[in-house]
Amino acid sequence: MVFSTIIFLFRFLPITLALYYLAPAKLKNTVLFLCSLVFYCWGEVRFFPVMVALILINYLSGLAIEHFDAKPALRKVFLLIALIGSLGMLFYFKYANFVLRSANALLGTAFAEIQGIGTLPLGISFYTFQTLSYSIDVYRRDVKAERNIIDFGAYVVMFPQLIAGPIVKYRDVSNQLHVYKHRYTLSQIEEGMTLFTFGLAKKVLLADAIGALWTDIIGVADSPSTTFVGLANASTPLVWLGIIAYSLQLYFDFSGYSMMGIGMGKMLGFDFPANFNYPYISASITEFWRRWHMTLSGWFREYVYIPLGGNRKGLKRQIMNLFIVELLTGIWHGANWNFICWGLYYFVLLAIEKLFLLPHLKKGKVWPHIYTLFLVVVGWAMFVGNDTGVSFGLLFQKLFIPSGGVSPLYFLRNYGVLLIVSVICCTPLIEKIWNTLRRNVITRCATILLLLVVSTAYVVGSTNSPFLYFNF
């Protein structure tokens, strides 16, 4: 089920909120758990046993780790069970066939692919990381093991962040899970509705609209339509325009989903961590990763980079730790070599900055922003082949070897205003304007109502457009 659909906006969400608000205080987590399972099973009912197994493995392992507090060996055994359970499911569904295909291609073997796992369980990359963080935190004694399986299940499958994050650690919401009375206030609900509306507008008014530019240029994989230009017919400037449009679409799509999820979390009485902080205004790649998908980079920093030694064991070890983290970041995004290349690409950039470039970037004013945006856009080009079936080699040939073809002028005339608005919305300017408008209750309500009505009208009048990060 997608947030930006009629069935979610007009059926699931209102019914769920009504049941949740009307439920007795001690039954709210039960309502949340059951409604979240309905949300998950709506289009993925065959993966319901996978979700249940993941919940049970980590719930029971957490209890066992805490129970055997004085027996380190047993604690490690149950932590290992939890890690193997979560990572094993992720590997089986997401990476097993990729490993087999890669082995066949590289080694000349003839391993048969596993049948029946062509479809990836929605959100598995996100909720497995949540269960991993829970079990590790219990082992570290950072949190107490959750004794109520309904409360634990509600944490794992909470629908606002289930499919595409933000990645929420158990300690982020454990206190709120156990507040049965006065969990939410009217101001929280209002703030949540505001965030949800802005997120919906980002998705349908910006991401989908600017994504149409990219589709008009490159087309859609396996689509019978011939109305698009096609990569082979596009000029180099047009391909650059398309990649810029894709970069904007990816940001508004993912940050819009995160904002909707955070907003719904507030409506339910939970404070989820922020996931984006205007990443396209960054003046270095290092800063970009502090602003982009912050819950993922934070997860890898806390559970991989720091345990490996972080910055504490010399420069060589630091660079090696960075290599491992960026490689895993690429692998996390998808079972495809283009994602591995993308992760290694960022490792090289981050290592160069760490070794010598960062002090020079801090002295600059304009060129560091241009440098960062250029490299980030090139990085997003590595994602494209996975989404559209476009030839990776042809795309980069078009980007970096000037070639003729269809001019971008037609597309600039049709999408120019949208491009300008999109670029402005990548900066804090809109937030500053909103902070001024919200001081007056009339302008605040009118702005939210207008955005909600217009966004909903677009949802009603358009076809279903899934969020891009559902693929990861």
Sequence positions of predicted segments:
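Membrane-embedded transmembrane alpha-helical bundles that form the catalytic cores
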Residues: 1-471
